[in-house]
């Protein structure tokens, strides 16, 4: 051997040995049918690793292989721990994947050395929404080299996000390329808006706004790492001239998301607003982001106020704010911006609004009665709160919140009304009770601040009857003011009819079907409509998914509710409000015609992006009467006395030998009314852009039409 090569060979050998010595050491990857030598206590972790999402859990991703630790076993209220056998610390870093809830004291992965916790990590999610994805994190443990240690996964948390996901725990000498933590950017507020880049489907980041060092609001944001799909708008006009700091909890090393945020004098959404291809033209939807339940519907200062569950920073559910829009005619709406933002009590869940005409709350000013919002703050605990305004634009949360403490974790959605005979406020509140299931609690108050339980109405076991978002109101039967009944309904619009003495509701008819369609949920009615008007007007959440857009979901058209006598007792009727007639651009009619099978389409020349069709007919010898609106099919089956709306069936009996049908068609769905409003069938549907046709057809005989009219409609925008 050449002596000159010996040092080189020795160096090569030592280097090779060093590389081998530095190979990663897997502590646990949670594959297989058991936890092995790890010791579990309690119920949260079960007896073996999970293989992904557990029942009732959002999709879990980002874990390694087929298994992971998931403490959602038996839901968020289960607790327990999972402890590893002892191991020697032999590498500089301890790397792991972690996700789930964020609670530094009750929900964490712990490293213990000499029996003491020396490192701890928790998940990213604090409030409703968020993501179950696991992300890479690590600790520098070089100071403990050679010492014995154990790992302990602790779940002592209950309620929302009361669980942790952990996987792939590894010792390594290579620092993992984990995300940057608590990344900040300072901004001097000079313009009224911040534009935040959003990428639909991107991992959610926790974005927190601080003003002069004080935390203002935090949101889960699908922050675009590069080119955004759209821009969310944050109004910062209240803090002009102040020092703002934006903080993101985790960011990939290469993400530009925080750098892309910029100030502007006008919202970035002033571009093609309301002209987007899937924007409903007769259904309200927010400028940007997600909406669900209508909230706080009230008539105040000569305006209809529509508040709604809103995520201004994402296309999907989360970050619950109260959005706000107003209208003078129930048809044309102006969105004003969010009025209730998440706070230390939690995200802003559903509720109602009233005008406190007598200023019982003391929240009025200079003789102006306050509008009072009553809402659920869905933190831990989940409580009921109020906010007020004397101008219908600026709202102040009550300093004495909450006005009603948590009963159970499943209490929410207060609907409040004034009960004139007892001179008290009445609240109906959804409460999920152990062993009793869905209930509605009735509370009374002299001032909207102090509430006393008056009674409880039970739902029906193993059903969704009276599940969440209750509404409660009085209506005359057949318009007769001396024959009035109270209606209690839940989110799916099933309802009860009965009497109310100011404290207790006594149902005479229970679990009656409301709407008969699909994609309709959490309807609410307006309070404080003028006495000379006297209508009970309802709007529901219309579940119209609009993929590829910067907004998602919408509201139904406003509906007038009445109680009508039937052989089975009083029943609700649903009819579109008369104000919608103002949208008619032109009238096409074929009144008085008898149509036979094979006759030409009387509306073959009609075209419309949004359309209204009305028909009253005697079916005669016809087997079916068929309406086509922008490619959707509405069939009346004469023998079955049944309506079939794009394949969805609903009972529709003749009334005095006749049938009446009204159809509203839009870019995102249909709303169909039959039987003088006793049958209401909403149905999300997306027509082809080029199909703007209307067609009426008779199968197997003839039908006589007393009324047959089609109206192309103007846009509400």
Regions found by a protein language model. Give the residues of each.
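Short beta-strands within extracellular/lumenal beta-sheet-rich domains
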Residues: 66-93, 104, 135-137, 178-188
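Hydrophobic core segments of beta-strands in well-ordered, beta-rich domains
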Residues: 96-97, 152-153, 196, 246-247, ...
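Extracellular carbohydrate-recognition regions
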Residues: 22-48, 175-176, 587-590
